[in-house]
């Protein structure tokens, strides 16, 4: 049975009366300075809806009673600054539904707001969705982000061909072309959950944000024909192999799609090897070079 997000938020939230009736002074009497600081941040987030930021350290499934007197398994993201476990149920993690595997989010830096405090149980419940709503409102109505702005983005999850980042309260999924001028066969070799990036705003609306990490930098293909004339040789690093082509990266970031010289075979070369390539041609529509591998360093 699908759990209604609004109902879940209400049922997991600690009431103000219950919170104010808790004997925090007695419970916190023997805490260390670090423990006290951790709990004070949790209390403040609950009381004033201030944001907390920590790293997702794993997943946990907890029982959740339903109206039919049955228990349903509720999967939660887990964050922990020091000793207090904070559970974020998956329905309260996203603002919009996504197909992202929750395991891919482990290691990501996320913002959240505390909605429930179990002081005696040494844990708390939070909602990332509330933090996203707050950040989105601030970005649109206070910061007034617009097309062309460069903003900070945090990698939420990364797969071989798609990456999701969080910026200004939006979860934005992008393909390889929006990430790098250099061809990337597997983006997980360059990006990981929790990584901090800069991204350029391509368009923005009340419920959408389009970004490009690639456009923050300079396109290395511009004037590449002057730096790497046809017939010249250059050091390059093999970045991937695909359909008989060997994708190599020059020191300035240009991609060279190569063939091997006749004396070489494919099993002599691996991804990450440094090689000498000879520049053979320029492919403007792909914005890459063609070349031939002449040697291995």
Regions found by a protein language model. Name each.
Residues 1-297:
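Single-stranded RNA-binding regions, centering on S1/OB-family and related RNA-binding modules
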């Amino acid at each position: 049975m699908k759990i209604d997000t609004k109902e879940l938020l209400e049922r997991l939230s600690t009431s103000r009366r219950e919170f104010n009736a808790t004997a925090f002074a007695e419970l916190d009497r023997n805490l260390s300075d670090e423990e006290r600081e951790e709990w004070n941040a949790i209390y403040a987030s609950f009381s004033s809806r201030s944001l907390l930021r920590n790293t997702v350290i794993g997943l946990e499934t907890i029982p959740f009673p339903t109206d039919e007197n049955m228990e349903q398994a509720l999967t939660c993201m887990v964050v922990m600054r020091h000793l207090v476990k904070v559970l974020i149920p998956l329905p309260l993690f996203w603002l919009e539904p996504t197909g992202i595997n929750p395991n891919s989010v482990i290691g990501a830096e996320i913002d959240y707001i505390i909605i429930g405090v179990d002081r005696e149980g040494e844990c708390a419940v939070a909602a990332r969705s509330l933090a996203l709503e707050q950040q989105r409102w601030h970005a649109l109505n206070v910061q007034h982000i617009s097309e062309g702005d460069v903003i900070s983005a945090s990698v939420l999850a990364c797969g071989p061909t798609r990456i999701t980042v969080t910026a200004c309260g939006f979860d934005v999924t992008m393909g390889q072309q929006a990430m790098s001028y250099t061809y990337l066969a597997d983006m997980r070799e360059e990006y990981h959950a929790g990584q901090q990036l800069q991204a350029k705003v391509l368009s923005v609306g009340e419920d959408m944000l389009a970004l490009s990490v690639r456009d923050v930098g300079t396109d290395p293909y511009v004037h590449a024909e002057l730096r790497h004339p046809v017939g010249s040789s250059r050091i390059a690093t093999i970045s991937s192999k695909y359909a008989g082509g060997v994708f190599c990266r020059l020191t300035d970031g240009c991609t060279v799609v190569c063939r091997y010289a006749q004396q070489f075979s494919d099993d002599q070369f691996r991804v990450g090897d440094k090689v000498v390539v000879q520049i053979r041609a320029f492919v403007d529509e792909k914005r890459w070079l063609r070349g031939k591998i002449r040697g291995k360093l």
